[in-house]
Protein backbone atom coordinates (compact mmCIF):
# COMPACT_ATOMS: atom_id res chain seq x y z
CA UNK A 1 0.00 0.00 0.00
CA UNK A 2 1.18 3.55 -0.74
CA UNK A 3 0.40 5.49 2.43
CA UNK A 4 0.45 9.24 2.99
CA UNK A 5 1.71 10.00 6.50
CA UNK A 6 1.66 13.29 8.37
CA UNK A 7 3.85 13.90 11.40
CA UNK A 8 6.52 11.49 10.22
CA UNK A 9 9.26 13.20 12.23
CA UNK A 10 7.21 13.32 15.45
CA UNK A 11 7.39 11.16 18.55
CA UNK A 12 4.55 8.88 17.43
CA UNK A 13 4.68 9.48 13.68
CA UNK A 14 8.35 8.53 13.33
CA UNK A 15 7.57 5.12 14.85
CA UNK A 16 4.52 4.76 12.61
CA UNK A 17 6.80 5.47 9.63
CA UNK A 18 9.28 2.81 10.75
CA UNK A 19 6.56 0.21 11.24
CA UNK A 20 4.80 1.00 7.97
CA UNK A 21 8.08 0.52 6.14
CA UNK A 22 8.78 -2.64 8.13
CA UNK A 23 5.41 -4.01 7.03
CA UNK A 24 6.32 -3.43 3.39
CA UNK A 25 4.31 -0.29 2.69
CA UNK A 26 5.49 2.65 0.61
CA UNK A 27 5.24 5.90 2.57
CA UNK A 28 4.79 9.42 1.26
CA UNK A 29 5.60 11.71 4.19
CA UNK A 30 4.28 15.27 4.12
CA UNK A 31 6.71 17.55 5.96
CA UNK A 32 7.15 21.28 6.44
CA UNK A 33 10.88 21.75 5.88
CA UNK A 34 13.84 20.48 3.91
CA UNK A 35 15.45 19.27 7.14
CA UNK A 36 12.40 17.17 7.96
CA UNK A 37 12.40 15.89 4.38
CA UNK A 38 15.94 14.61 4.86
CA UNK A 39 14.97 12.81 8.07
CA UNK A 40 11.97 10.97 6.62
CA UNK A 41 13.94 10.11 3.47
CA UNK A 42 16.62 8.53 5.66
CA UNK A 43 13.84 6.45 7.25
CA UNK A 44 12.76 5.17 3.83
CA UNK A 45 9.88 7.51 2.99
CA UNK A 46 9.33 9.70 -0.04
CA UNK A 47 9.18 13.26 1.31
CA UNK A 48 6.82 15.95 0.06
CA UNK A 49 7.30 19.45 1.45
CA UNK A 50 4.07 21.38 1.83
CA UNK A 51 1.44 23.02 4.01
CA UNK A 52 -1.09 20.65 5.53
CA UNK A 53 -3.57 23.50 5.97
CA UNK A 54 -3.67 24.04 2.19
CA UNK A 55 -6.68 21.80 1.57
CA UNK A 56 -6.55 21.83 -2.23
CA UNK A 57 -2.85 20.96 -2.27
CA UNK A 58 -3.22 18.22 0.33
CA UNK A 59 -6.23 16.73 -1.45
CA UNK A 60 -4.11 16.46 -4.61
CA UNK A 61 -1.42 14.57 -2.67
CA UNK A 62 -4.03 12.25 -1.18
CA UNK A 63 -5.54 11.33 -4.53
CA UNK A 64 -2.27 9.65 -5.49
CA UNK A 65 -2.09 7.23 -2.54
CA UNK A 66 -3.99 4.19 -1.27
CA UNK A 67 -4.52 5.30 2.33
CA UNK A 68 -3.49 7.92 4.88
CA UNK A 69 -2.45 8.23 8.52
CA UNK A 70 -2.60 11.64 10.23
CA UNK A 71 -0.39 12.01 13.32
CA UNK A 72 0.81 15.60 12.89
CA UNK A 73 -0.23 18.23 15.43
CA UNK A 74 1.02 21.74 16.13
CA UNK A 75 0.14 21.20 19.79
CA UNK A 76 -1.06 24.75 20.32
CA UNK A 77 -4.10 26.97 19.83
CA UNK A 78 -3.97 26.39 16.07
CA UNK A 79 -4.66 22.65 16.50
CA UNK A 80 -8.44 22.81 15.89
CA UNK A 81 -8.14 24.66 12.57
CA UNK A 82 -5.17 22.50 11.60
CA UNK A 83 -7.13 19.28 12.04
CA UNK A 84 -10.22 20.73 10.36
CA UNK A 85 -8.13 21.54 7.29
CA UNK A 86 -6.63 18.06 7.11
CA UNK A 87 -10.01 16.39 7.55
CA UNK A 88 -11.49 18.63 4.86
CA UNK A 89 -8.80 17.56 2.42
CA UNK A 90 -9.26 13.89 3.29
CA UNK A 91 -13.02 14.11 2.78
CA UNK A 92 -12.49 15.76 -0.60
CA UNK A 93 -9.99 13.13 -1.77
CA UNK A 94 -11.18 9.92 -0.08
CA UNK A 95 -14.92 10.49 0.22
CA UNK A 96 -16.91 7.72 -1.44
CA UNK A 97 -13.82 5.56 -1.97
CA UNK A 98 -12.53 2.47 -0.16
CA UNK A 99 -9.26 4.18 0.80
CA UNK A 100 -8.71 3.93 4.58
CA UNK A 101 -8.00 7.03 6.65
CA UNK A 102 -6.62 6.88 10.21
CA UNK A 103 -7.04 10.00 12.35
CA UNK A 104 -5.51 10.74 15.76
CA UNK A 105 -7.31 11.70 18.96
CA UNK A 106 -6.29 11.42 22.61
CA UNK A 107 -7.57 9.70 25.72
CA UNK A 108 -8.44 12.94 27.49
CA UNK A 109 -11.60 13.26 25.37
CA UNK A 110 -13.32 10.86 27.78
CA UNK A 111 -12.68 12.90 30.91
CA UNK A 112 -12.34 11.20 34.29
CA UNK A 113 -13.77 7.74 34.84
CA UNK A 114 -13.05 4.10 35.60
CA UNK A 115 -13.45 1.16 33.21
CA UNK A 116 -13.54 3.55 30.25
CA UNK A 117 -13.77 2.26 26.68
CA UNK A 118 -14.50 3.52 23.17
CA UNK A 119 -18.22 3.80 23.89
CA UNK A 120 -17.86 5.88 27.05
CA UNK A 121 -19.43 9.35 26.84
CA UNK A 122 -17.11 12.10 25.63
CA UNK A 123 -16.32 14.63 28.34
CA UNK A 124 -13.12 16.41 27.28
CA UNK A 125 -11.36 19.05 29.35
CA UNK A 126 -11.02 22.55 27.92
CA UNK A 127 -7.65 21.70 26.36
CA UNK A 128 -9.19 19.17 23.97
CA UNK A 129 -12.78 20.38 23.97
CA UNK A 130 -12.56 20.97 20.22
CA UNK A 131 -11.87 17.35 19.34
CA UNK A 132 -15.41 15.87 19.30
CA UNK A 133 -16.62 18.32 16.65
CA UNK A 134 -13.66 17.59 14.36
CA UNK A 135 -13.90 13.86 14.95
CA UNK A 136 -17.59 13.92 14.06
CA UNK A 137 -16.52 15.21 10.64
CA UNK A 138 -14.35 12.11 10.31
CA UNK A 139 -16.88 9.56 11.55
CA UNK A 140 -20.12 11.06 10.18
CA UNK A 141 -18.98 10.95 6.58
CA UNK A 142 -18.57 8.63 3.61
CA UNK A 143 -14.99 7.85 4.61
CA UNK A 144 -13.54 4.47 5.50
CA UNK A 145 -12.26 6.11 8.66
CA UNK A 146 -10.84 5.12 12.02
CA UNK A 147 -9.58 7.21 14.92
CA UNK A 148 -6.71 5.89 17.02
CA UNK A 149 -7.03 7.26 20.56
CA UNK A 150 -3.63 7.05 22.26
CA UNK A 151 -3.24 7.13 26.01
CA UNK A 152 -0.31 8.94 27.63
CA UNK A 153 2.41 7.71 25.30
CA UNK A 154 5.79 6.70 26.72
CA UNK A 155 9.00 4.97 25.72
CA UNK A 156 12.51 5.77 24.50
CA UNK A 157 12.76 8.47 27.17
CA UNK A 158 10.16 10.68 25.50
CA UNK A 159 6.67 12.04 25.98
CA UNK A 160 4.66 13.29 28.94
CA UNK A 161 6.32 11.08 31.59
CA UNK A 162 9.17 13.58 31.55
CA UNK A 163 6.81 15.96 33.36
CA UNK A 164 7.21 13.56 36.28
CA UNK A 165 10.91 12.81 35.81
CA UNK A 166 11.85 16.48 35.49
CA UNK A 167 9.40 17.83 38.09
CA UNK A 168 10.67 20.39 40.59
CA UNK A 169 11.83 19.37 44.06
CA UNK A 170 10.68 20.84 47.32
CA UNK A 171 12.99 22.09 50.05
CA UNK A 172 13.48 18.55 51.32
CA UNK A 173 14.43 17.23 47.89
CA UNK A 174 11.13 15.47 47.32
CA UNK A 175 9.77 15.23 43.78
CA UNK A 176 6.67 17.43 43.41
CA UNK A 177 3.73 15.57 41.90
CA UNK A 178 1.03 16.83 39.55
CA UNK A 179 -1.76 17.52 42.04
CA UNK A 180 -1.94 15.09 44.93
CA UNK A 181 -0.81 12.23 42.69
CA UNK A 182 -3.81 9.98 43.30
CA UNK A 183 -5.10 10.34 39.73
CA UNK A 184 -4.63 7.37 37.39
CA UNK A 185 -3.25 7.77 33.88
CA UNK A 186 -4.00 5.51 30.95
CA UNK A 187 -0.64 4.73 29.33
CA UNK A 188 0.80 2.99 26.26
CA UNK A 189 4.29 2.43 24.83
CA UNK A 190 5.03 4.42 21.69
CA UNK A 191 6.05 1.31 19.73
CA UNK A 192 2.77 -0.39 20.63
CA UNK A 193 0.92 2.76 19.63
CA UNK A 194 2.56 2.72 16.21
CA UNK A 195 1.71 -0.96 15.79
CA UNK A 196 -1.96 -0.17 16.37
CA UNK A 197 -1.95 2.52 13.68
CA UNK A 198 -0.60 -0.03 11.21
CA UNK A 199 -3.12 -2.69 12.26
CA UNK A 200 -6.02 -0.26 11.95
CA UNK A 201 -4.87 0.92 8.53
CA UNK A 202 -4.28 -2.59 7.22
CA UNK A 203 -7.74 -3.70 8.33
CA UNK A 204 -9.19 -1.53 5.55
CA UNK A 205 -12.27 -1.04 7.72
CA UNK A 206 -14.14 1.86 9.26
CA UNK A 207 -13.31 0.99 12.87
CA UNK A 208 -14.56 4.13 14.60
CA UNK A 209 -12.51 5.01 17.66
CA UNK A 210 -9.89 2.47 18.76
CA UNK A 211 -8.09 2.95 22.06
CA UNK A 212 -4.32 2.55 22.28
CA UNK A 213 -3.99 1.81 25.98
CA UNK A 214 -2.77 -0.87 28.38
CA UNK A 215 -4.41 -1.97 31.62
CA UNK A 216 -1.53 -0.65 33.75
CA UNK A 217 -3.35 2.51 34.93
CA UNK A 218 -0.63 3.80 37.29
CA UNK A 219 -1.25 6.74 39.58
CA UNK A 220 0.96 9.78 39.21
CA UNK A 221 2.34 8.97 42.66
CA UNK A 222 3.26 5.48 41.39
CA UNK A 223 5.18 7.11 38.56
CA UNK A 224 6.99 9.53 40.82
CA UNK A 225 7.97 6.79 43.25
CA UNK A 226 9.18 4.61 40.36
CA UNK A 227 11.93 7.15 39.74
CA UNK A 228 13.36 6.24 43.13
CA UNK A 229 12.50 9.60 44.65
CA UNK A 230 10.51 10.55 47.68
CA UNK A 231 7.42 12.40 46.48
CA UNK A 232 5.06 15.07 47.74
CA UNK A 233 1.65 16.15 46.48
CA UNK A 234 0.97 19.65 45.23
CA UNK A 235 -2.20 21.73 45.71
CA UNK A 236 -4.21 21.91 42.50
CA UNK A 237 -3.96 25.69 42.33
CA UNK A 238 -0.15 25.46 42.41
CA UNK A 239 -0.12 22.77 39.71
CA UNK A 240 -2.30 25.01 37.54
CA UNK A 241 0.02 27.95 38.10
CA UNK A 242 3.07 25.84 37.28
CA UNK A 243 1.78 24.08 34.17
CA UNK A 244 -1.03 26.33 32.96
CA UNK A 245 -4.67 25.80 33.90
CA UNK A 246 -5.84 23.97 30.77
CA UNK A 247 -2.84 21.62 30.59
CA UNK A 248 -2.93 20.94 34.32
CA UNK A 249 -6.63 20.11 34.28
CA UNK A 250 -6.00 17.49 31.58
CA UNK A 251 -3.14 15.96 33.58
CA UNK A 252 -5.32 15.93 36.70
CA UNK A 253 -7.96 13.71 35.07
CA UNK A 254 -8.40 10.36 36.83
CA UNK A 255 -8.77 7.75 34.07
CA UNK A 256 -8.70 3.95 34.11
CA UNK A 257 -8.94 1.67 31.08
CA UNK A 258 -8.60 -1.92 29.97
CA UNK A 259 -6.91 -3.12 26.78
CA UNK A 260 -9.36 -2.36 24.00
CA UNK A 261 -11.44 -5.27 22.70
CA UNK A 262 -11.51 -3.49 19.34
CA UNK A 263 -7.72 -3.35 19.24
CA UNK A 264 -7.45 -6.98 20.33
CA UNK A 265 -9.78 -8.01 17.50
CA UNK A 266 -7.28 -6.46 15.09
CA UNK A 267 -4.53 -8.68 16.51
CA UNK A 268 -3.01 -5.98 18.72
CA UNK A 269 -1.67 -6.47 22.21
CA UNK A 270 0.79 -4.36 24.21
CA UNK A 271 4.34 -5.68 24.00
CA UNK A 272 6.44 -2.89 25.48
CA UNK A 273 7.73 -2.62 29.04
CA UNK A 274 5.42 -1.00 31.57
CA UNK A 275 5.81 2.69 32.28
CA UNK A 276 6.67 1.99 35.92
CA UNK A 277 9.52 -0.28 34.80
CA UNK A 278 10.66 2.24 32.21
CA UNK A 279 10.87 4.90 34.91
CA UNK A 280 12.58 2.63 37.42
CA UNK A 281 15.24 1.06 35.23
CA UNK A 282 14.52 1.73 31.56
CA UNK A 283 14.81 4.60 29.12
CA UNK A 284 13.85 7.36 31.58
CA UNK A 285 16.29 6.15 34.21
CA UNK A 286 19.00 6.13 31.54
CA UNK A 287 18.10 9.66 30.47
CA UNK A 288 17.90 10.93 34.02
Protein language model features and the residues they cover:
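Mid/C-terminal beta-alpha module of Rossmann-like enzyme folds, strongest
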Residues: 2, 196-247, 286-288
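C-terminal amphipathic/interface module of NAD(P)-dependent oxidoreductases
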Residues: 50, 249-288
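Glycine/proline-rich active-site loop of Rossmann-fold NAD(P)-dependent oxidoreductases
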Residues: 153-165, 171, 200-210
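N-terminal Rossmann NAD(P)H-binding glycine-rich loop of SDR-like oxidoreductase domains
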Residues: 3-23
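Conserved beta-loop-beta element that borders a ligand/cofactor-binding pocket
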Residues: 135-157
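A conserved pocket-lining segment of Rossmann-fold NAD(P)-dependent short-chain dehydrogenase/reductase
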Residues: 166-188
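Conserved Rossmann-fold NAD(P)-dependent oxidoreductase catalytic core, especially the SDR/UDP-sugar
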Residues: 26, 87-128
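NAD(P)-cofactor binding segment of oxidoreductase domains
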Residues: 57, 61-102
Amino acid sequence: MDVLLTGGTGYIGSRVLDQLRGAGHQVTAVVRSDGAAERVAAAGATPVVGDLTDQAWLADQLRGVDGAVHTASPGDASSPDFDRAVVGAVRAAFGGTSKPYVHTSGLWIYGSGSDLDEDSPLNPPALTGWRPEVEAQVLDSDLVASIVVPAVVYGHGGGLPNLVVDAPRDGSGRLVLIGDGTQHWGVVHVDDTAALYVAVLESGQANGRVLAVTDENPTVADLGEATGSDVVGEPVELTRARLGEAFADALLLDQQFRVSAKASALGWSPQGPTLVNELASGSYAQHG
